[in-house]
């Protein structure tokens, strides 16, 4: 397993696909074919929404967004597909096939984005609240090949409960991301133990998995 700790300085700024906004790319999973075509298997990013505008369309993809800060936005994807995102840290899943218009409630806001090619991946997004000293243990699905922990509030200590206690834990600060990526040669850890560092802590836990996982196990389908 490969573990990478990223700070906001590592996130790559880029324009939205439709050119109407800005996103900071945290991680993207691409093959050589994707590099040539501009596609991807999965992507994690933070978008800054400064004005109301249409969202970029991602045909064949499932999306999950989480409001990080600001008053929020209203999303209109057609009849029966309206959603108000005004409460931070509440995941909302919808289809990238939809034409979605965004109206800001009051001023700019930011949101965390998970996008997966539904033919090649599924995503699960959970919000985890921690209070010291009680830790939480995260357990992998057999289909998981990437985990990401993004700290929404506070700071977290992350360790492998199956390793000797002498193994040093990792400290993950607010808006930093811990990526844990498995491969055939080095599978993903089955468990992670997460604790709050000194105060109330809130995390986004994102799992990217192969499509063999059932829809009931994922949060990616609208």
Which residue stretches match the model-derived regions?
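Jelly-roll (double-stranded beta-helix
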Residues: 1-222
């Amino acid at each position: 397993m490969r573990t990478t700790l990223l700070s906001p300085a590592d996130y790559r700024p880029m324009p939205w696909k439709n050119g109407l906004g800005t996103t900071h790319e945290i991680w993207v999973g691409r093959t050589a074919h994707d590099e040539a075509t501009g596609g991807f298997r999965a992507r994690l990013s933070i978008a800054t929404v400064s004005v109301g505008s249409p969202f970029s369309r991602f045909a064949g993809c499932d999306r999950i967004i989480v409001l990080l800060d600001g008053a929020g936005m209203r999303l209109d994807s057609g009849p029966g597909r309206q959603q108000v995102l005004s409460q931070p840290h509440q995941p909302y899943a919808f289809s990238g096939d939809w034409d979605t218009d965004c109206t800001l409630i009051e001023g700019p806001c930011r949101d965390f984005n998970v996008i997966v090619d539904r033919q090649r991946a599924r995503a699960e997004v959970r919000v985890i609240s921690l209070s010291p000293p009680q830790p939480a243990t995260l357990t992998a699905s057999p289909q998981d090949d990437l985990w990401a922990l993004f700290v929404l509030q506070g700071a977290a200590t992350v360790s492998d409960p199956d390793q000797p206690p002498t193994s040093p834990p990792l400290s993950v600060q607010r808006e930093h991301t811990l990526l844990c990526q498995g491969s055939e040669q080095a599978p993903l850890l089955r468990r992670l133990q997460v604790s709050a560092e000194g105060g109330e802590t809130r995390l986004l836990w994102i799992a990217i998995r192969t499509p063999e996982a059932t829809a009931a196990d994922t949060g990616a389908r609208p």
